[in-house]
């Protein structure tokens, strides 16, 4: 992969435009940025070829499922951390894999169809990997914001307003055809409607209508990610905190409005809030926490850590400097090997039968020191 210089201002404006309108044609983007269509296309090709920026999309809801996200901490034995991380990063339902500073080795963010699926993943996938020492999982009860909504914020206000399309929010329940469409788009989010129609055996009109419905209903999350070091955000930090339940809505609304915040999630567990931020320097971590304390004094930060290497971000594998290496389209976890192992455990639980020990065999005696008499058992 070629080495590339850091982003210039036009690069960052292009990224912001694509974060807002990821499928806009180059002519529209060129007019928005005040350059030619060929310039925008050429710029984007250079960024993607260097692994500095990339597009992605993934479903936020699945047909007939109450899917959810879990934040999993993984401890590894010495010398096995990256072996474990690489195996976990290959799992298609895993959004993020991060090597952290502090008391946990890896942080994994993944999606699951139900709680039983999470149990199988912890017990029969992670638990079976050579090098995994321990796992701890917290379930995301509310996702207040996530990284697909983060913006580079490099467009002028007038341009930014012009690029935003206001659409009414409607509740959309996806079906199997929607899932096929979203999975296909995950491989190339700018795939033309005609080619999408050909790959999914749908008409172009149907594809366009479904895409509009999925986007306006927030079923499909579009994202344009960047190599954060090259983009000027070299520090990625994560904070765990506790909030009184009655203050969660007010405090998280403030957090979501802070530019540095990439993820803000309410979770189960003793720390009921998890926040991820991008920062310009380590010094900015203290400044961010100071602002946080002034805005939300009732929030207690219980722990914090810094990313050492984010190996996976939104389904994309990254090098140590945050550049994209390759993509793994996000999809449901293929559970079969783990499910087979779980079924064997269930069968063992179902068929194991150990009769309670006879009092005499167990050495049980009554108040008088004698063994109680049992019906049908003759004294020896």
Residue ranges and their predicted role:
Residues 1-380:
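A compositional/biophysical signature of low hydrophobicity enriched in polar/charged and small residues
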